[in-house]
Amino acid sequence: MKYRTLAGTDLELSTIGFGVWSVSTGWWGPVDKEAGEALLNRAFDLGVTFFDTADTYGEGYGEEIMKDALSSHRQQIVIGSKFGYDLDAPREGHKERPQKWDPEFVVEACNRSLKRLGTDYIDFYQAHNARLSTIESDDLFDTLDGLVKAGKIRTYGIAVGPDIGWVEEGEFTIQKRHVPAQIIYNVFEQEPGRRFIEVATEEGVGVVSRVPHASGLLDGTYTRDTPIEFDASDHRTYRKKQWLEKGLNKLDEIQFLFESSDGTVAQ
């Protein structure tokens, strides 16, 4: 495993992180606690030290599973978590929850996350899918600075989303706030991620890439020769069929990258 410092912070991360969303919510099929904990521990054994979760994953379970699986390794890992969604508000299916950003809510969300994680600090605390008006708000960043001073978080940033795009949000985060951004970036989906990376390099700001395997299309699981069926609870079930067909077409185009080597498509 290789490690590097997240630019603009003192956080040293493994270059490959673990996204806890996939093992803590029913959005990828049924949740299996034993399998999820085994995967987290296996990742740690292989050198992964950066684990990214959120309070909204599994209604808090995405943080609780971190405590259950990795609490004995707390000093060796970097925990990223996210906030901003009102967990007390009702949710319809896969629709987005209401967001809240007032100082009292943010502080309470942090305290609840600390309890679920079983730790007294969060390394990388991210505003979850914050919109431009929120990122422009000094109140939010004053609150986050207060959490840093209180020792409850080490540093903070913005998780840009929820889906691909959000150019203004990403650029404002990097250029004006000068804090790390978590973005969507993979071989299939390179824009606007490529632009964000260029700007971040110019500004000396870190970027964390998520969805590196294009929601499973780049992990070697799916090909034209294998039946592709998603569980009814899997969020990919609700995507347009064109998404899968387009992804398989792109997968055909990059076969040359690994056919003549010992590497896999995931690598």
Predicted regions located by residue number:
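Beta/alpha (TIM)-barrel catalytic core signal, keyed to glycine-rich beta->alpha loops juxtaposed to Asp/Glu
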Residues: 130-267
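N-terminal binding-site loop/beta-alpha segment at the start of enzyme catalytic domains
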Residues: 1-78, 89
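Active-site mouth loops of central-metabolism enzymes
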Residues: 22-34, 92-104, 129, 133
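Short, well-ordered coil/turn segments that N-cap beta-strands
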Residues: 11-16, 47-50, 73-77, 119-123, ...
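Active-site groove signature of glycoside hydrolases
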Residues: 114-133
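Conserved, mostly hydrophobic/aromatic
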Residues: 6, 18, 36, 51, ...
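Short, acidic/polar
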Residues: 30-43, 101-117, 163-171
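Structural motif corresponding to the early beta-alpha repeats
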Residues: 76-100
